[in-house]
Amino acid sequence: MSLMVVSMACVGFFLLQGAWPHEGVHRKPSLLAHPGRLVKSEETVILQCWSDVRFEHFLLHREGKFKDTLHLIGEHHDGVSKANFSIGPMMQDLAGTYRCYGSVTHSPYQLSAPSDPLDIVITGLYEKPSLSAQPGPTVLAGESVTLSCSSRSSYDMYHLSREGEAHECRFSAGPKVNGTFQADFPLGPATHGGTYRCFGSFRDSPYEWSNSSDPLLVSVIGNPSNSWPSPTEPSSKTGNPRHLHILIGTSVVIILFILLFFLLHRWCSNKKNAAVMDQESAGNRTANSEDSDEQDPQEVTYTQLNHCVFTQRKITRPSQRPKTPPTDIIVYAELPNAESRSKVVSCP
């Protein structure tokens, strides 16, 4: 079945046939779906191909079906060129993966690199599944939450979407339990609520989904500062890189401050110990000089011959003798004894 195309912002279109042009000459454009890539049966979706490169022509191609390549003349506004492809009413043959290309007038067979792929899914074809939350739709901030999508239909895959999110999370259905097939979506600790829906699909038709489940509003009690991870992201995340850098910087500053304080304290201690040692050395030198003076009594042993009789007495140093000189004339003679000095006194 050929596509029914209505241009919303461009003039004219025609179906390309013949050889495929050369790709990758220009930078790739972007491809968006309005209002979204999940399209209910019989509804219409707008696929917009745009670029900041001034393309005169845009081509829309659905993978796997070469005959469904469409061409539109681009429209230019504020440095942006774009073309809007209207696809609808949506049927099973129109679902699939789309890419778009851009080209210029002087080289129409030299195309840009292809845009990133965009999957267009038709919904509303089968019975809707049920969606529930464990432990419940109202939880405390930080409490772990698991959403369960189940149905009596033997769907191979279940898809969970969150309102406002561009992509969905999918899980294979588990074994049949009590007449139902189920898939569990662990969301991790809750920090912020949201509205969720789930769909079922079969393995041989991945772009054809069931009706959506009834919306499930998950509410979080509290005033969390962070958003709840989307179902397409892991529930456990690392911290904010900026906060991590701040934490590392603070730790480094604290460590440097502690090291500086330790070095300053050690320097002051060494200086104080050096002053004490200098004082002790000076005291020791003073004490040693006093001990030397005390150990040298400067005593002299004399032998006096009085009236030709030898007597021995101890005479103090001259500074300690009486000031009145003796009447006798005394003659001294040194003896060779090193420890004591002997004097020979001759009688007149």
From Swiss-Prot:
GO cellular component: plasma membrane
Signal peptide positions on this chain: 1-21
Domain Ig-like C2-type positions: 42-107, 142-205
Highest taxon listed in the record's lineage: Eukaryota
GO BP field: immune response-regulating signaling pathway
Carbohydrate attachment residues: N84, N178, N211
InterPro entries in the cross-refs: Ig-like_dom_sf, Ig-like_fold, Ig-like_Receptors_ImmuneReg, Ig_sub, Immunoglobulin_dom
Keyword Nucleus on entry: no
Membrane topology: Single-pass type I membrane protein
Segments passing through the bilayer: 246-264
Subcellular location: Cell membrane
Membrane-side (Extracellular) residue stretches: 22-245
Family per similarity comment: Belongs to the immunoglobulin superfamily.
Protein name: Killer cell immunoglobulin-like receptor 2DL2
Gene: KIR2DL2
